[in-house]
């Protein structure tokens, strides 16, 4: 095992609590997600019910050994994938049913935009291939409770205090989408 990051290695002095996915650029830069700066691995249910933007997209430079936050305020930052030409990187926002695009090169470098939104389920991991297709795993269909309670923190707190057996349960169904580099579904 090689340890290249400590929990306190972020440039913003925010601990890395839930490092989730990564992709490595040809120059060695490591792009990765921290799903939640508040909760650690195994606490995704808390993150789901709290529904707050605690996630981040970061990059680690192995030469300078510095970690930089590229995007913060993400709702459970999850899968990460570079485009085939490495001009942008994608990061899933699981709790918002969408994927963000962060530009690395060109006129838009350093900015972000929505790559695709209103996905039919929670996007989990994402990977890309040489043909420019992004394969996105969706681990459950959209959840009515998440949608209804997204702007009702009091309701979410009440539900969190219920025994887990009485809390809303996910539908266990997963599927995969293939997206082109413009965010259009080309395989489902």
Where do the language-model regions lie?
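Sequence-structural signature of mature extracellular/luminal beta-sheet repeat domains
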Residues: 1-188
């Amino acid at each position: 095992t090689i340890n290249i990051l400590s929990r306190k290695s972020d440039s913003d002095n925010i601990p890395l609590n839930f490092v989730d996915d990564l992709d490595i650029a040809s120059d060695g830069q490591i792009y990765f997600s921290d799903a939640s700066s508040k909760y650690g691995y195994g606490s995704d249910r808390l993150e789901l019910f709290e529904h707050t933007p605690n996630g981040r997209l970061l990059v680690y430079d192995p030469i300078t050994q510095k970690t930089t936050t590229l995007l913060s305020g993400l709702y459970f930052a999850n899968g990460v994938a570079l485009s085939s030409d490495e001009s942008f990187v994608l990061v899933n926002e699981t709790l918002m049913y969408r994927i963000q695009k962060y530009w690395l090169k060109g006129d838009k470098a350093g900015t972000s935009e929505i790559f695709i939104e209103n996905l039919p389920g929670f996007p989990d991991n994402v990977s890309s291939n040489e043909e420019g297709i992004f394969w996105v795993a969706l681990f459950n269909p959209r959840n009515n409770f998440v949608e209804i309670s997204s702007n009702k923190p009091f309701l979410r707190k009440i539900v969190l205090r219920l025994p887990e057996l009485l809390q809303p349960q996910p539908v266990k169904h997963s599927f995969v989408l293939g997206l082109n580099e413009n965010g259009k579904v080309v395989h489902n």
